[in-house]
């Protein structure tokens, strides 16, 4: 808040955006690029080097996968964008379910080589249940 008690960014300019897909489709890598190009990070973190901003747990860094949904904030134009990077492994589907409840929209990533994979279909159906609007992002081209 500012000195006069008002929000620095009005609530109407907040966006809660989820990143969802099958494991290894590039969710965390894409999130790292968003953070870099919006000026949030000065360096792009790499999943397989254990330097990704969003994979903060030691086990995530060791395994190179997202285990828990992680949230961060960046800014674009006049908007505050809260990004939630969700796990892609089937064992962590409930993490995606929890995140969907607060999303204004989601980016659904698809690996251009692997195509539509089972967990992508699962998270798509989950987003349908919560009425979350999505855009598709085809990755690894």
Swiss-Prot record:
Pfam families: GTP_EFTU. This is Elongation factor G, chloroplastic. It comes from the Eukaryota. NCBIfam families: small_GTP (TIGR00231). Transmembrane segments: none annotated. GO terms for molecular function: GTP binding; GTPase activity; translation elongation factor activity. It comes from Pisum sativum (Garden pea). GTP binds at residues 21-28, 85-89. GO terms for cellular component: chloroplast. PROSITE patterns: G_TR_1, G_TR_2. Keywords: Chloroplast, Elongation factor, GTP-binding, Nucleotide-binding, Plastid, Protein biosynthesis. Chloroplast-localized elongation factor EF-G involved in protein synthesis in plastids. Catalyzes the GTP-dependent ribosomal translocation step during translation elongation. During this step, the ribosome changes from the pre-translocational (PRE) to the post-translocational (POST) state as the newly formed A-site-bound peptidyl-tRNA and P-site-bound deacylated tRNA move to the P and E sites, respectively. Catalyzes the coordinated movement of the two tRNA molecules, the mRNA and conformational changes in the ribosome. GO terms for biological process: ribosome disassembly. Residues 12-141 form the tr-type G domain. Disulfide bonds: none annotated. It is found in: Plastid, Chloroplast. Pathway: Protein biosynthesis; polypeptide chain elongation. Belongs to the TRAFAC class translation factor GTPase superfamily. Classic translation factor GTPase family. EF-G/EF-2 subfamily.
